[in-house]
């Protein structure tokens, strides 16, 4: 039996996903700013720290060593991403909920990091996963949202 999806359910998935991720992302960053000084670390588990750092670049601190132009460039890229992905969602069929969710996750992550760039001039990163002395790049909830959205899209595109 086919499920029925209304236009409202498509919007509901889209809006709820974005709002949930934004609340989680913004709240977590505010707590980090409030309770952990920049470059300080709080051990959470043996493989997880909260390490408060300001990223002036993109993923893996790409472009962070530039003289400030990257803030505007990355903000523009984020805005274009948000607009293009929103347009894609409006063109998707109502029953394409996995794609709608994936694009919504990417939009939410891009929006969360864009908000940081606008208000702080950098992105607040704090999730530090490590094994002994090896540390993965520090990231945040918005980055996780973007990553998960991309993985979902890749699975959809490579499984069909």
Swiss-Prot record:
Catalytically driven reaction(s): Release of signal peptides from bacterial membrane prolipoproteins. Hydrolyzes -Xaa-Yaa-Zaa-|-(S,diacylglyceryl)Cys-, in which Xaa is hydrophobic (preferably Leu), and Yaa (Ala or Ser) and Zaa (Gly or Ala) have small, neutral side chains
Top-rank EC class of the record's enzyme: hydrolase
GO terms, biological process: proteolysis
Gene Ontology molecular functions: aspartic-type endopeptidase activity
EC id: 3.4.23.36
Presence of keyword Cell inner membrane: yes
Designated name of the protein: Lipoprotein signal peptidase
Record membrane topology: Multi-pass membrane protein
Alphabetized InterPro entries for the sequence: Peptidase_A8
Pathway linked to the protein: Protein modification; lipoprotein biosynthesis (signal peptide cleavage)
Gene field: lspA
UniProt keyword terms in alphabetical order: Aspartyl protease, Cell inner membrane, Cell membrane, Hydrolase, Membrane, Protease, Transmembrane, Transmembrane helix
Active-site residue list: 125, 143
Cell compartments where the protein resides: Cell inner membrane
Entry GO terms, CC: plasma membrane
Similarity annotation: Belongs to the peptidase A8 family.
Pfam family, one: Peptidase_A8
Bilayer-spanning residue ranges: 13-33, 72-92, 104-124, 134-154
Function comment: This protein specifically catalyzes the removal of signal peptides from prolipoproteins.
